[in-house]
Amino acid sequence: MRLAGIPNLAVSASTPLSLYTRFGIGGPADLFAETRDEGAFMAAIAAARESGTAVMVTGGGTNLIVSDAGFRGLVVRFADDTLSAEAERVTAGAGAVLQDLIDFANHRGLKGLETLAGIPGWVGAAVYGNAGAYGHSISERVRAVRFFDGSAVRIFDHAQCEFAYRESIFKRHKDWIIFSAELVMDAGEAGELERTSADILKVRNEKFPPTMKCAGSIFKNFLITELPPPVAGLVPANVVREGKVPAAWFLEQVGAKGMRFGGIRVADYHANLIYNAGEGTARELCAVIAELKGRVRERFGIEVEEEVQYVG
């Protein structure tokens, strides 16, 4: 595979993917390439295909669980973190840190993202998974998404993105790679927006300290309308928030809090927070996830669904 001649592409060999995941877990990639340039990214993908090399695309690595064996092939990281604004429209590169986008908008008095403060990861992943908090999701502000479908660069408008709760069309087409997103904001008062985000960030950092090796919540919450009626009837009314039941409630009922296996822990204060306490492995993390899924299935007859993605 010929990568050396591609401009604006940094390439390394036998790169530990644990350096690029929030869990701090994962074996080496045979080859690791990083770029902020769309042309270099597409050239790297083409080179891998021509040589028959397996390829994986990553971003901030917040929601990735990488095998202890790593990845046999090429890992490409698209890291364009450009942010720009024109009136009430903001364009964000997929490699921009979501919090940086929020700060950028708040500082300019652009309202609409302030409640997403503290959600880890990059903009591309936030759009991909329709990240949200406090009753709001990033999709509310997305006007258009620019992406690579494997052969050409395309632009989808909001409707074409098919957003739903923690879902988008990009989740169903994992070979489509988001390059950037255009967002439409409302006019607001910068100081008020910054205070709102600061308050939310303080609460989130108490639950998910920035230094903690975790992906935030592991499992998706449930829409109360999608639960079987007998199960929905078991949920206390005060647990349901904005039509959703926290996965943590089900996990708490099956004894998740404080669970330990090897270097992996479930927080004793939050049943949906699994973290690497130091020397945890992907095998141990997957074992804990599987155990919790099995307990909820046996007790309630429902499936808790991961927000994380598996590699290798």
Swiss-Prot record:
Record EC number: 1.3.1.98
Name of the featured protein: UDP-N-acetylenolpyruvoylglucosamine reductase
One GO process term, biological-process aspect: peptidoglycan biosynthetic process
Active site location: 166, 217, 307
Annotated compartments: Cytoplasm
Keyword flag Cell division: yes
Recorded family membership: Belongs to the MurB family.
Domain (FAD-binding PCMH-type): residue spans on this chain: 24-206
Catalytic activity: UDP-N-acetyl-alpha-D-muramate + NADP(+) = UDP-N-acetyl-3-O-(1-carboxyvinyl)-alpha-D-glucosamine + NADPH + H(+)
Gene3D superfamilies, alphabetized: 3.30.465.10, UDP-N-acetylenolpyruvoylglucosamine reductase, C-terminal domain, Uridine Diphospho-n-acetylenolpyruvylglucosamine Reductase, domain 2
